[in-house]
Amino acid sequence: MAYVDGFLLPVPKKKLPAYLRMARKAGRIWREHGALEYRECVGDDLDVKMVLPFPRLAKAKRGEAVVFSWVLYKSRADRDRVVAKVMKDPRLAKMPKEMPFDMKRMAYGGFKVQVTA
């Protein structure tokens, strides 16, 4: 069963270019170690009225973009294997120590894929 790691985070718009540079590097590392997909999406159509909008869920402040990201794996076991390799990759240690966003406001979780259409 396919598995997804999902992320939702607010990123200051002035730091968005730095975040995306970091994400491109991270995406290459994850893909090289076996992730099937690595996606970083910046909010565009987020002014919704009928449901809880992502900016409110992410507690985005004025001047922040909302980023929705996911990484797709073959299975939970494959995800565990890939992430273990990624964490040992020396390129990850070269990433900036200071993140271009507030880590305390990032949401994360692992999900079993139930429907693929």
Please name every model-derived segment:
Residues 13-15, 77, 114:
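Residues that cap or initiate secondary-structure elements
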Residues 31, 35-62, 88-117:
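Glycine-rich beta-strand-turn "strand-cap" elements at beta-sheet edges
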Residues 4-11, 50-86:
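Short, well-ordered beta-strand segments in beta-rich or mixed alpha/beta enzyme
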Residues 18-31, 66-71:
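Generic detector of contiguous secondary-structure segments
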Residues 20-26, 82-90:
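Short amphipathic alpha-helices in soluble, non-transmembrane regions
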Residues 1-25:
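Long, hydrophobic N-terminal alpha-helical segment
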